[in-house]
A protein has these predicted regions:
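Feature activates predominantly on carbohydrate-active enzymes
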Residues: 96-319, 335, 360, 364, ...
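Aromatic, loop-rich ligand-recognition surfaces of beta-strand-rich domains
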Residues: 576-640, 651-689
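Acidic, contiguous N-terminal accessory segments
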Residues: 25-156, 372-375, 379, 383, ...
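Active-site neighborhood of glycoside hydrolase catalytic domains
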Residues: 274, 284, 289-385, 392-395, ...
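Predominantly extracellular/luminal regions of secreted and cell-surface proteins
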Residues: 537-573
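Flexible, acidic glycine-rich loops studded with aromatic residues
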Residues: 371-377, 382-387, 393-538
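Bacterial Sec-dependent N-terminal signal peptides
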Residues: 1-34
Length: 689
């Protein structure tokens, strides 16, 4: 017990000072590893530290444009120049830098009085500044020694979907600031989709006078409602768009931070908004009828070329994204113009007809000195000669692309779709579905093991995508982006052999604190709930390891086997994600009808199975479950019939259908029947106790 209040106060001051020392470079050993994200390629440590006190002399030896950008980057984090100071930061543009092969690489040498950063390109020096800034913000010093660093991949991107819900210019610039801090260099803007056209095209004013505005503010209300568009200025019009001046401002703002903005203009699908504003570009020539352009109509190519001409004037990026995904092609087989086009061009099917459009648009874009990116569906029907593939439906698209000698950007939904839940659904805002915690994002390696070194070199990079169907606000958008985009950043930058999740998590926790201090609505990683508790340990029960027989007409779906015939009695429960290879999926009319052989008669007190509902991808709870038991597998007596009124909602929910009582049986029959809505049923384990 302290002698008096003065003693207590002195102890508090000593403790606070010791804590501050630990937070301010007092121990050099882990400062860089815990605060620089992405983790650097190589660190050589020396004794001592450079502290940011008493003013800093700043010297920059680079072209004027780079010098202005670099000085601004230092100023933005609070490092200001004092030409009379005894300490200095020197940024040098060099012809070559030891240990660096990438133009985005850098080398920082630190003594107690001087920091010298070298790079062969303005971008490299900019990333050196980001490393300096992270340490300055975190601990107000830099340990002495040398950091040699460069990116693993050339393309390190974030995609913002600004169609499903529109996010304004200042918000986009704010995200540019954040991703630049973590050495990301591409911002992909998904500018067009059914939910709204978001960029001014002067030759086609109806795209922003009409196609940019819809009848409901929330995408889900509009999509499951009337799906009507509105005139700009109408009382019930919701939406927005970027003027061409807005785009120029965003592009320049990004360029000043060494980020390239890549525009996406969807074709031939996801174009309801265009075809309602300009219905003559569809196969039916009627508004509100089509999502796909009429590929046989020559006017479509005139429209697309005119749009892309204005887009390329606004966006100087080498790459233009032209979509190419999820075309229904429903009207093409019967459309006279499409049929005529197929005959004239000798096209065998509608997949080749889509490839005709993609290849033709590629030739146009190439003629302007640019190249195209498309979602992996552009592989169907033949890949355009110079296209880069963005692989989202798993990794197969990327593998096929590099096998054919094309570049691939890896963004598989399983690891890179940041619109999925990042924590337990009950603790998070409603999301599109799935469960993608930061640890799983971080586990992804964009280079498949099956690739040769030459093929691996064609993996251009990685991208995190934030689809906004269920993200109506800027605050929620940030919550979904951060901190998971930090995992994407480190995957894209750091050597594979340097990556370690526990060490990354420490960096990410520190980064989240900084992001929140800077006004970003980042998810608080320190309060992560984690995966579904039953999934964390095996469940030992009477049916574990026992044989399961599936009735004719009740097979599990090939994509969701969860390991096959043993899945429902393997003792392993699923997590929050139906795609985690633990949930078995059923879609046939027979529903679920299985029989478990316990091998001998057992005294049984309970039988239960959990089911998942996630309506957006079409996963529903059973409308009815029947549980029965038998001693001989021929005569079954019903233990329970459980009905349920299936109601569509937005949230992920789990429900247990079970029986409790007392019986003896060797065989357990478990049947689950779908409701009128159809869709999938998913269950993970039939637990018998």
């Amino acid at each position: 017990m302290p002698k008096n209040n003065s003693d207590l106060m002195i102890k508090k001051i000593i403790f606070a000072a010791a804590t501050l020392l630990l937070l301010s470079c007092g121990d050099n050993s882990r400062v860089i590893e815990e605060n620089v994200l992405p983790t650097p390629m190589h660190i050589e440590k020396a004794s001592g530290k450079f502290t940011f006190d008493g003013g800093i002399k700043i010297e920059i030896n680079a072209p004027v444009e780079d010098s202005i950008r670099l000085l601004q980057a230092l100023t933005d984090v609070g490092i200001t120049a004092n030409n009379n100071a005894g300490k200095s930061i020197t940024l040098l543009l060099c012809d070559s830098v030891a240990g660096i092969t990438s133009p985005e690489g850098y080398r920082i040498n630190t003594t107690t009085k001087h920091i010298t950063a070298e790079g062969t390109n303005g971008a490299g020096l900019f990333y050196a500044v980001q490393t300096i800034a992270q340490l300055y913000n975190a601990v107000n010093c830099i340990p002495c020694g040398t950091i040699t660093d460069q990116p693993r991949f050339e393309y390190r991107g974030l995609m913002l979907d600004v169609s499903r819900h529109f996010f304004g210019k200042e918000y986009v610039k704010k995200q540019i600031d954040a991703i630049a801090r973590y050495k990301m260099n591409r911002l992909h803007l998904h500018l067009t989709d059914a939910a709204g056209w978001r960029v001014e095209i002067k030759q086609y004013p109806r795209l922003t006078q009409f196609a940019a505005w819809r009848s409901q503010e929330l995408w889900k209300d509009w999509w499951y409602g009337d799906r009507q568009y509105r005139e700009e200025g109408a009382p019930d019009a919701h939406g927005g768009y970027y003027t061409q001046e807005d785009i120029r401002e965003i592009v320049q703002y990004a360029a000043d931070r060494y980020i390239t903005v890549i525009p996406e203009i969807e074709m031939p699908a996801h174009s309801e908004e265009v075809l309602t504003a300009y219905p003559q570009l569809s196969c039916t020539h009627e508004p509100y009828k089509q999502a796909d352009f009429c590929v046989g109509n020559e006017e479509v190519y005139t429209f697309l070329e005119n749009v892309l001409t204005e887009i390329m004037e606004l966006f100087p990026s080498k790459y233009i994204h032209i979509g190419g995904d999820e075309a229904a092609k429903a009207s093409w087989p019967t459309c006279p113009l499409c049929k005529s086009r197929m005959k004239e061009e000798g096209l065998a099917n509608v997949n080749e007809l889509q490839s005709y459009l993609i290849e033709r648009m590629e030739r146009f874009v190439n003629s302007k000195g640019r190249s195209i990116i498309g979602w992996d569906e552009i592989l169907e029907g033949g890949l355009a000669p110079n296209a880069t593939v963005m692989s989202w439906r798993g990794t197969d698209g990327g593998i096929k692309a590099v096998h054919a000698g094309h570049k691939a950007i890896m963004t598989p939904g399983e690891f890179c779709y940041l619109d999925s839940y990042q924590d337990a659904p009950h603790a998070q805002p409603v999301a599109f579905g799935g469960y993608l915690p930061i640890e799983k994002v971080y586990s992804y390696n964009p280079v498949p093991d099956s690739l040769t070194p030459d093929e691996a070199a064609l993996i251009y990079g990685i991208q995190g995508n934030v689809w906004a169907e269920y993200i109506p606000t800027e605050q929620l958008n940030e919550h979904m982006i951060y901190p998971r985009i930090l995992a994407i950043a480190e995957i894209g930058w750091s050597p594979q052999e340097k990556r370690n999740y526990e060490q990354f998590r420490t960096r990410a926790l520190n980064a989240v604190k900084q992001l929140r201090r800077n006004g970003y609505n980042a998810f608080d990683l320190s309060r992560e709930y984690g995966n579904r508790p039953p999934s964390l340990a095996p469940n030992n029960h009477l049916a574990k390891g026992k044989k399961v027989a599936y009735a004719t007409g009740s097979p599990y779906y090939p994509t969701y086997t969860a390991g096959g015939d043993s899945a429902l009695t393997d003792g392993i429960h699923g997590g929050w994600n139906n795609s985690d290879k633990r949930w078995q999926g059923f879609i046939g009319r027979g529903g679920i009808d299985v029989c478990i052989d316990l091998e001998e008669e057992k005294r049984i007190k309970s039988i239960a199975a959990d089911f998942m509902q996630l309506c957006e991808p079409g996963i529903y709870l059973p409308a009815e479950v029947e549980i029965s038991a038998s001693a001989d597998s021929s005569t079954f007596h019903t233990l329970a019939t459980i009905g349920h009124n299936v109601v569509r909602d937005d949230t992920l929910s789990l429900k247990s259908y079970g029986w409790e009582g007392e019986t003896k049986a060797r065989y357990i029959r478990y049947r689950a029947i779908r409701g009128k809505q159809g869709g999938f049923m998913f269950t993970d384990e039939i637990v018998v106790k």
